Amino acid sequence: MSAVNTPAGFTDFKVADISLAAWGRRETIIAESEMPALMGLRRKYLAEQPLKGAKILGCIHMTIQTAVLIETLVALGAEVRWSSCNIFSTQDQAAASIAAAGIPVFAWKGETEEEYEWCLEQTILKDGQPWDANMILDDGGDLTELLHKKYPAVLDRVHGVTEETTTGVHRLLDMLAKGELKVPAINVNDSVTKSKNDNKYGCRHSLSDAIKRGTDHLLSGKQALVIGYGDVGKGSAQSLRQEGMIVKVTEVDPICAMQACMDGFELVSPFIDGINDGTEASIDKALLGKIDLIVTTTGNVNVCDANMLKALKKRAVVCNIGHFDNEIDTAFMRKNWAWEEVKPQVHKIHRTGAGDFDPQNDDYLILLAEGRLVNLGNATGHPSRIMDGSFANQVLAQIFLFEQKFADLSAEKKAERLTVEVLPKKLDEEVALEMVRGFGGVVTKLTQQQADYIGVTVEGPFKPHAYRY
């Protein structure tokens, strides 16, 4: 697609500035050259049109890389309606380029909470009525939840949902356990080519990029505390170590904690003896009083709480690369401390009380992206080559679920298919192979003797389902 002028009469969109479309198109063309797996799938399945008839409701960060995803879905036959899953993550030139191509999109950087909810609604509605959608592509679960709570009738036609993130998968599993989930779901997050690339290697690239763009600080020689050591935490700790920071890690899972130790990070707790009893007395003030930067990476709630924020070193930087802004107790900060905007998505939080503040006061924290995703709020997120794996998985997951035609099954068959599953390993390997080829790499092929010896086929899959990469 190369259009940069909105089709005549097309008004089914809302973006910050449609005149940014040409800029967005130029960046999208560059991104395509850095997304070999996604573009490989576009070429491979173009003639087959596996998504012909698919009507996809999409809610994922409206970035340049997402523009390539959207246009791949459309090229393979789908119709889509789109919004962003985060109020700060939209790249306005990307949204404009999609609108200019005649694709409904409702997203702009710096939405209010009310505008965010409105954009979600517009994704679902066409001409004021629920669109006859039959697929969902989500990031974080807000769109899926809204459909279940407010538009359940739409779900009668939906074949499934593909979910991008850890947080969204947790919400899906919770809904499934409670008997609330009405459609099957593919857990894209736990595909190896998503979790290792996006969560780990992506954060390794984009965390330090965002912090430096937001603060213009030198990071080397300073102390950082990374909260959580899952894949996002691992990538984040590596990102800060690459900058020369002295990195400490806190964890609740003994296995992840062991990995942090084995990777050479000091494992600490912000709480004395690791016990948070909810009081200031339980805080390790000696530890937090030396921390220059704290990063939350967990997808859990209140992992950087009010008492921790009180104990942090003056002028410490606070940010989140998990998912929602409830990882950091921003509600406490809004209620009790004064906020001074330095520039968009960068605030000085004066710990001298609410209301007025002295601009020369030095007892403040620097909060990035208001506690939301720092890499998308203060920078442009993961690079195209990283998102290539994630979005190739999304395309394959959409094709996989669309072909299953869940909505057309009998009630008995639906009950059997109502699950939250990862993509088959063979498809994960398909994405990985395309990515390797994009790097110019050559994968060695097993001989028949070797394949027989380890009990696999020459074409794969090559590892058992439970293998941990």
UniProtKB/Swiss-Prot annotation:
NAD(+) binds at residues 165-167, 199, 228-233, 251, 300, 321-323, 375. This is Adenosylhomocysteinase. The gene is ahcY. GO terms for biological process: L-homocysteine biosynthetic process; one-carbon metabolic process; S-adenosylmethionine cycle. Gene3D superfamilies: Adenosylhomocysteinase-like, NAD(P)-binding Rossmann-like Domain. Its cofactor is NAD(+). One of its GO terms (cellular component) is cytosol. Pathway: Amino-acid biosynthesis; L-homocysteine biosynthesis; L-homocysteine from S-adenosyl-L-homocysteine: step 1/1. It comes from Pseudomonas putida (strain W619). It comes from the Bacteria. Substrate binds at T63, D139, E164, K194, D198. Its EC number is 3.13.2.1.
